[in-house]
């Protein structure tokens, strides 16, 4: 790997294959959330720099789209090998800038690596369809062709996985790409981009700019950008979808969530409790697919003390420390927001079963730590239920029947993920049929599909009809062209002028 992205050097822009020092006057700190140490600074690119990145991508598209599909596949094969080789180093940087544990950082990278592996089979994924002799001597076939320059806007919570959801599949399809990583933790993302260059991605095919709303808006409105992929908050995702859509872009916008885990009394108790605690408090609750609501059904209401006892055992510490279960949240601002929501839950009458507000971590006293926090007695009008908390806070609601649980989940505006814990096949089938959520786990707490499928959040969690990775994203990053052809022999009989719409 080149020294241009050595950890803890200031972030640079990537334009036309060159790492560029930004000429901006606006720089932001990249802060270790466990220590408040400033690791590096990230520039907010100027308008001219954003335009230069897009122009480089537009120029590169003219040749990249003609690159044989086998050559693109071989670059993906090299990239996945390089990611494996450097994964531990990347995970160390990711943990330092984002706060998650080393093991979780490695998982972040691995789940993205799976998408790169799937991109290695782009030759079969991008094939069109063919129908022979649809009319006399007439054949019809489709071509899946790249659409042009695509943009990706990624969040802080998965600085490896989500960029890898985007740019590998986009460029494997023959497009070029402009990536805007999160300004809060871009260093590990840049390490992955460096590996993409080392794997053979040509100059201009992959570009990187940093910034805030101005850069986001530029990507959404520039004439040469044909598609925008976004993962992040509902507020920003709605803005991106509306703005880019008004400017004629394809848009996929993955947004907020309120994921419910429904627990029936016949579920395997130990496995279920472990799953709930891991999915609720892992990554400090900063996952768009985190379990944030536990719905205890019928006799499962008696499980609350066990849930509390297990959550109390989790170790809160810096992500770099061995044995850590829960690291810090990303920033002081995020911590204050979560603390405010906890306070609102108390004021609105929920029962605070486990209070993580005043936790102290020796050696990391300045860290953005919140311990596992558990509420019971929660109602659907409380802020801790209606808002996405994005912190280590789990709320418990009790109902009497599975039908009531399904109605509860379906009444929530979000539709990212849900899970049912049961030993009953009949209950599982009923749940998966009647639930109005895009991704369903049966005894699986975080049902994020593997890349052979696609990420299929729904309702208030997603705007756009095609999701990231899998077959859907190949559709998103390609244009279908349908060709209908007829070839005549020299001795073909001329049927004269055909003034009808029928082929003959």
Question: For the regions a protein language model found, what residue spans apply to each?
Answer:
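Residue-level signal for inorganic ion chemistry
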Residues: 36, 72, 94, 116, ...
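Rossmann-like NAD(P) dinucleotide-binding subdomain of oxidoreductase/dehydrogenase enzymes
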Residues: 128-273, 399
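Conserved C-terminal structural/oligomerization subdomain of aldehyde/semialdehyde dehydrogenase
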Residues: 37-40, 201, 225, 262, ...
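Structural signal for hydrophobic packing residues in well-ordered secondary-structure cores
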Residues: 61, 65, 80-87, 91, ...
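Short, well-ordered beta-strand elements within core beta-sheets of diverse protein domains
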Residues: 39-45, 60-66, 152, 261-264, ...
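Hydrophobic face of amphipathic alpha-helices that form TPR/SEL1-like repeat modules
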Residues: 1-34, 357
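ALDH superfamily catalytic-core signature
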Residues: 235-379, 402-403, 442, 492-493, ...
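Glycine-rich loop-to-alpha-helix module at the N-terminal edge of alpha/beta enzyme cores
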Residues: 37-126, 137
